[in-house]
Amino acid sequence: MSKDGINSKDFLIGTLIGGIIGATTALFLAPKSGKELRDDLGSQAVALRDKTDKMTADAKEKGTQYVSIAKDKTSNITQLVADQSGQIMNKVKDLRDRSKSDKTDSSTAMQDMREEAMQAADETKDQVLQTKEDVKDELKDAQKQAEQLNR
């Protein structure tokens, strides 16, 4: 037991002496005084905070821009669908009126009405799909830029 006490005592003394020697060496070999070192660390912390604030502001601005783009594209789709629906309804009414005035050509008029309605629906579908792809591309670009800002 006395050996364990001596080993612990020797270890504590060695640790204390080693700490004092290390601290003294660090003070003598430091390239700057403590005040200069604290000032440099403070200025670097301020610069880092400013850079972080700028990156946060940029990310918020880009996010706002992409939300605006998505809203514009969505409103364009809505307007496009409304316009196409109105055109289809007008064509249907026109063809119905024509078929009423000319009973002999009613089957032809119905066929024309179907074809025009299908054509208008296809056009609307194509435009909506294209706008959807545009929005998807814009969102991918936004995501890439957000990832770059996070690096």
UniProtKB/Swiss-Prot annotation:
The segment annotated Disordered runs over 89-151
InterPro entries named among the record's database cross-references: Desiccation-related_membrane, YtxH
Pfam families documented for this protein: YtxH (PF12732)
- Name the residue ranges with Basic and acidic residues bias: 91-105, 112-151
- UniProt similarity note: To C.plantagineum desiccation-related protein clone PCC3-06.
Stated name of the protein = Uncharacterized protein YtxH
Organism in which the protein naturally occurs: Bacillus subtilis (strain 168)
Q: Which gene encodes it?
A: ytxH
